[in-house]
Amino acid sequence: MKEKSKNAAKTRREKENGEFYELAKLLPLPSAITSQLDKASIIRLTTSYLKMRAVFPEGLGDAWGQPSRAGPLDGVAKELGSHLLQTLDGFVFVVASDGKIMYISETASVHLGLSQVELTGNSIYEYIHPSDHDEMTAVLTAHQPLHHHLLQEYEIERSFFLRMKCVLAKRNAGLTCSGYKVIHCSGYLKIRQYMLDMSLYDSCYQIVGLVAVGQSLPPSAITEIKLYSNMFMFRASLDLKLIFLDSRVTEVTGYEPQDLIEKTLYHHVHGCDVFHLRYAHHLLLVKGQVTTKYYRLLSKRGGWVWVQSYATVVHNSRSSRPHCIVSVNYVLTEIEYKELQLSLEQVSTAKSQDSWRTALSTSQETRKLVKPKNTKMKTKLRTNPYPPQQYSSFQMDKLECGQLGNWRASPPASAAAPPELQPHSESSDLLYTPSYSLPFSYHYGHFPLDSHVFSSKKPMLPAKFGQPQGSPCEVARFFLSTLPASGECQWHYANPLVPSSSSPAKNPPEPPANTARHSLVPSYEAPAAAVRRFGEDTAPPSFPSCGHYREEPALGPAKAARQAARDGARLALARAAPECCAPPTPEAPGAPAQLPFVLLNYHRVLARRGPLGGAAPAASGLACAPGGPEAATGALRLRHPSPAATSPPGAPLPHYLGASVIITNGR
């Protein structure tokens, strides 16, 4: 009896095992796997397979499974599913409404280290981070649709991020945190709708399952991502303030890296996409990795480009705390709507570009208009009456910012001087003809000059001085320029020296002090007279120290003889002075006075703060002075300064910007 019962139990178990074996062979799995399954695994896999048939009752469908007649591509069609899985950098999974995994591809083992058999039929909640359980529940829940669908089945798109358990070795796992790996899941929630008999518009729905593709971020097989022409990367702080940008950002957006550093990414994103970026930023801080949706990144001059970013939080190796964010960005399109400005930076950039184009076009038009006059000016160039000047490096930079060598007043800094209006010489070694004016003005004042720099450069000469060629004034200038220098005292004069006009009879009005203050006035340097300083009072009454002159102490016999010869030559030149040096005719009150030719000396001015002695003259110059009987004969007068002519100790230093304007701002 006992033997019969033992034999019966053995036979039953054998039949049961046989049935399980037959059932395992029906599973869509390789025989090498099914032969090693236990009974529980076979039941679990079978129930999951049956649920999958309910979700996809037609399987692969007529297009793949059963062709009408044999063909050369039959083998490829049968293996199409496996080929797609190998091509896809991820794994496919189907989850029921209760969280049970109905299907997952064998490629999950590449990303998670978990086998297909182990995952299929088990709850997905066992393999995701506890903090992501609520999110997974929300993904599997479908709210009542707002409108009734006429279709029996419809789908709701889903895209989310899960931290799934990863048991791979550290060298193959990629980026993991506490044994979990961020997986980007994208797919749809399949819903089946049933119509009720009670009402035509009443219906109920059933959640069939979630079909999704999981991809690891970044791809686990790539440790160093190669950046192509449509890609750039940036490093930012945890609040998305940019710290470093790849130089490729210039090619795709127009921004230089230094334009975006220390600025937040939110300021350069389309306003309609800020919410999506904020949500991705939140997920990034919570889960450590994220792939953003497609968003619009504003370009520099207008419009935007579509971008998708793969961002990762980098942790400190010592403290294991979040340190910064590294993002690899894929630019998907060219710049769209280039004429549309959506930010203040785009507007300012467009305005600056338009102003530059306008200035360039204006300069080109002026060049065309002045070209005939320029040709005429070339034929009237005269030789330089001065010896080659020597400039310092700072003075050279200052000379390049104005109309150099021109006897007219320099234009304001805001007005661009056309290069054609500036005199030039074809034989000059150095042309001081800038094609544009700087957008800022220099600070005016006294600058030390080094006479040993740029000794080989030749300054340009103006084409017209306002008097005929070879006039006595020109000879006088040449004579004065050859006077020897003594000590550290030098002659300085500011451009313009003589105001030029279309005719010698017309006298230009004296420029006001406020306009001359902002003009780019170059300064020249000439040898100083070591014996006497002559000048004309060109300063307002408020500056008595600049209006009177005195005779210097007695000289030695040899120097006195040379000085007497020079005085005789000056008197001879003064008697033959032309119109520009003759005494001016009396004019009506209020009429603008003609600017005299003045050589200003800063010896006295610099003596207050510099190393020069206090006995130097205050200010001296040579002028064809009007008024008095001595002026009628062309003789020069020497004036002695009064006691009131000395400046008080706290008086501001005068700054000479022209022949008739003195600026008192002591900068």
From Swiss-Prot:
SUPFAM superfamilies xref list: HLH, helix-loop-helix DNA-binding domain (SSF47459), PYP-like sensor domain (PAS domain) (SSF55785)
Chain spans, region Disordered: 356-389, 409-428, 500-520
The PAC domain, residue ranges: 292-335
Record InterPro entries: bHLH_dom (IPR011598), HLH_DNA-bd_sf (IPR036638), PAC (IPR001610), PAS (IPR000014), PAS-like_dom_sf (IPR035965), PAS_fold (IPR013767), PAS_fold_3 (IPR013655), SIM_C (IPR010578)
Domain PAS positions: 77-149, 218-288
Compositionally skewed regions (Low complexity) per UniProt: 409-419
Keywords: Developmental protein, Differentiation, DNA-binding, Neurogenesis, Nucleus, Repeat, Transcription, Transcription regulation
Effect of mutating residue 385 to A: Reduced nuclear translocation
GO molecular function, a single term: RNA polymerase II transcription regulatory region sequence-specific DNA binding
Keyword Transcription regulation tagged: yes
Outcome recorded upon mutating residue 371 to A: No effect on nuclear translocation
Primary localization class, coarse: nucleus
Bias-annotated ranges (Basic residues): 369-381
Record domain bHLH: where: 1-53
Record's keyword annotation contains Transcription regulation: yes
Domain Single-minded C-terminal: 336-667
One Pfam family named in its UniProt record: PAS
Effect of mutating residue 376 to A: No effect on nuclear translocation
Subcellular location: Nucleus
PROSITE patterns: BHLH, PAS, SIM_C
Motif (Nuclear localization signal): 367-386
Assigned GO CC terms: chromatin; nuclear body; nucleoplasm
Subunit structure as annotated in this protein's UniProt entry: Efficient DNA binding requires dimerization with another bHLH protein. Heterodimer of SIM2 and ARNT.
Function: Transcription factor that may be a master gene of CNS development in cooperation with Arnt. It may have pleiotropic effects in the tissues expressed during development.
Protein name: Single-minded homolog 2
Native species: Homo sapiens (Human)
